[in-house]
Amino acid sequence: MTVAVGHPGGNRHIGGDLQEGTAIFGGDEPTTDFGRLARTVRDIGVPLVARVNGACVAGGMGLMALCDLAIAADHARFGLPEARIGVFPMQVQVYFRHLILPRHAAELMLTGELINAERAREIGLINYVVPAAEL
């Protein structure tokens, strides 16, 4: 089974719209949608391959990390931009921090900077980088 993160017609979206700022995280009700999605993916019972074509950020990083393998197009970007608005990626970091060294995880979680596909492969976040046409 393949989990596609992003596609040529635009990016798929998982999680809150960060354009709204921290207001999306300030409600009285806890957000449980991502947790339910993560449990479903984790418990699916078949090998999963993430195909990343575009931006893989925020909740998309968590979903990708739940997959057994990850392949990215050479133009893909990865990151946790919620850090830029003062939100720590608490839900997402649980799923990817074991894949990479602690300092690499801290860099992603604290800076909110995006990294390219080759850097993501270098730090162990993904397995392969391929030309977009081969994805």
What do these predicted regions represent?
Residues 6-40:
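Glycine- (often His-adjacent) and acidic-residue-rich active-site loop
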